[in-house]
UniProtKB/Swiss-Prot annotation:
Record remark: domains: Composed of three domains: a modulating N-terminal domain, a DNA-binding domain and a C-terminal ligand-binding domain. The 9aaTAD motif is a transactivation domain present in a large number of yeast and animal transcription factors.
Ranges where the record places region Hinge: 153-182
Positions of region (Disordered): 54-76, 417-458
Quaternary structure (record): Heterodimer; with an rxr molecule. Binds DNA preferentially as a rar/rxr heterodimer.
Biased composition (Low complexity): 440-458
Predominant location category: nucleus
Source species of the chain: Notophthalmus viridescens
Summary of the function given for this chain in its UniProt record: Receptor for retinoic acid. Retinoic acid receptors bind as heterodimers to their target response elements in response to their ligands, all-trans or 9-cis retinoic acid, and regulate gene expression in various biological processes. The rar/rxr heterodimers bind to the retinoic acid response elements (RARE) composed of tandem 5'-AGGTCA-3' sites known as DR1-DR5. Retinoic acid signaling appears to be involved in specifying proximal-distal axis in limb regeneration.
GO annotations of cellular component type: nucleus; transcription regulator complex
Compositional bias per record (Polar residues), positions renumbered to this chain: 54-68
Subcellular location: Nucleus
Pfam families attached to this UniProt entry: Hormone_recep, zf-C4
Residue ranges annotated as motif 9aaTAD: 408-416
Protein name (Swiss-Prot/TrEMBL): Retinoic acid receptor alpha
Length: 458
């Protein structure tokens, strides 16, 4: 069939015996790129190109013959997947070139870990073990030697590790920014000293025990209660001494000092006794060395509060808090602007801010690989408040169980813990801790309270 080499779309030519307009002539500039070189140059144009012109029979014949020659090219086949040589180490299927050779994922990871961790392996045979995909895990020494023999590069692993270090650099900079400034260090040391001077560590105490009701829970053991109430009174006095040593505490109004002490005293007492918990023996030790087991603590007056306190003590163990952290957490519990009835809550908040910052920096500096330890410690304050609320209720029920009256300092500091007055339905009483006119701090001190009775049981 004759052809003049024209290039036309298949829509041109005859359709059911009727001529069909050839649209290639309307848009020659659009189709020129699809035509072979010179294919349109030799085509005569017998009529002027017009939107309404009809091609001549000769032109139709030319279009018909040329349209039969256009065959759409088949789609190009997809590229063949890249095929790597088997793993040079174990002959398993390779996943690509790793550290200089074709290797499988298993050998790649083994080599990387071995180099990064400076692993030293031992062969239990003659150092000629066969390494293939079945035996590769049997001898790490020979597998590593095979990696070196086939050309795996230590430097490639180190370079890869350096790239990751650069990517992680911003995180490292954030960690390194927690440096202890002289101001923070001074605050930490003052709080640590205040804590240590008012609360000796467990290792400094000569522990002793008692056989009183050590095996069976009872509602109240009077002898244990007498001892417990005496020790509790001394602990309250030490808590007040601790507060007076905290920077800025005595600059607060007398009313706010008393409000904060009464609201947080039980929090601090519970936190302190829980740091003297011995998990192996399930005992707690008081400041004079008296060591009580769980049953004895219950019978001494803790009652239904006992298991809550011991559970909290167990939760503190993973934190491994030192004296500075315990002191700072106690100070944060005490100096807290959200307590009820404060005259200057904003001033209290400002005093608390450096304590929070000091604890955060100290904890993160001491545990650089445990960034979540600081928020975990702060969450313990919520737990302490929950236990303290139940402890304040326990003081009320104890008044009905003990013979005689409650020791005045325990009743004053613990029964009137925050929120308890609304629970009892009674208005707050005037505090016996109120200092004389002109005093700059609460009048409560060891010298002024040692003469007060510590037990009123018969």
């Amino acid at each position: 069939m004759a052809s003049n080499g024209g290039s036309c779309p298949s829509s041109g030519g005859h359709m059911n015996g009727y001529p069909v307009p050839h649209y290639a002539f309307f848009f020659p500039h659009m189709l020129g790129g699809l035509s072979p070189p010179g294919s349109l140059a030799g085509i005569p144009h017998p009529l002027p190109v017009s939107a309404y012109s009809t091609p001549s029979p000769a032109t139709i014949e030319t279009q018909s013959t040329s349209s039969e020659e256009i065959v759409p090219s088949p789609p190009s086949p997809p590229p063949l997947p890249r095929i790597y040589k088997p793993c040079f180490v174990c002959q398993d299927k390779s996943s690509g070139y790793h550290y200089g050779v074709s290797a499988c994922e298993g050998c790649k990871g083994f080599f990387r870990r071995s180099i990064q961790k400076n692993m030293v392996y031992t062969c239990h045979r003659d150092k000629t073990c066969i390494i293939n995909k079945v035996t590769r895990n049997r001898c790490q020494y020979c597998r590593l030697q095979k990696c070196f023999e086939v050309g795996m590069s230590k430097e490639s692993v180190r370079n890869d590790r350096n790239k990751k270090k650069k990517q992680e650099a911003p995180k490292q900079e954030c960690t390194e920014s927690y440096i202890i400034t002289p101001e923070v260090e001074d605050l930490v040391e003052k709080v640590r000293k205040a804590h240590q001077e008012t609360f000796p560590a467990l290792c400094q105490l000569g522990k002793y025990t008692t056989n009183n009701s050590s095996e069976e829970r009872v509602s109240l053991d009077i002898d244990l209660w007498d001892k417990f109430s005496e020790l509790s009174t001394k602990c309250i006095i030490k808590t007040v001494e601790f507060a007076k040593q905290l920077p800025g505490f005595t600059t607060l109004t007398i009313a706010d000092q008393i409000t904060l002490l009464k609201a947080a005293c039980l929090d601090i007492l519970i936190l302190r006794i829980c740091t003297r918990y011995t998990p192996d023996q399930d005992t707690m030790t008081f400041s004079d060395g008296l060591t009580l087991n769980r049953t004895q603590m219950h019978n001494a007056g803790f009652g239904p509060l006992t298991d809550l306190v011991f559970a909290f003590a167990n939760q503190l163990l993973p934190l491994e808090m030192d004296d500075a952290e315990t002191g700072l957490l106690s100070a944060i519990c005490l100096i807290c602007g959200d307590r009820q009835d404060l005259e200057q809550p904003d001033k209290v908040d400002k005093l608390q801010e450096p304590l929070l910052e000091a604890l955060k920096i100290y904890v993160r500096k001491r545990r650089p690989n445990k960034p979540h330890m600081f928020p975990k410690m702060l969450m313990k304050i919520t737990d302490l408040r929950s236990i303290s609320a139940k402890g304040a209720e326990r003081v009320i029920t104890l008044k009905m169980e003990i013979p005689g009256s409650m020791p005045p300092l325990i009743q004053e500091m613990l029964e009137n813990s925050e929120g308890l007055d609304s629970l009892t339905g009674q208005p707050p009483r005037a505090s016996s801790l109120a200092p004389p006119p002109g005093s700059c701090s609460p009048s409560l001190s060891p010298s002024s309270n040692r003469s007060s009775p510590t037990s009123h049981s018969p």
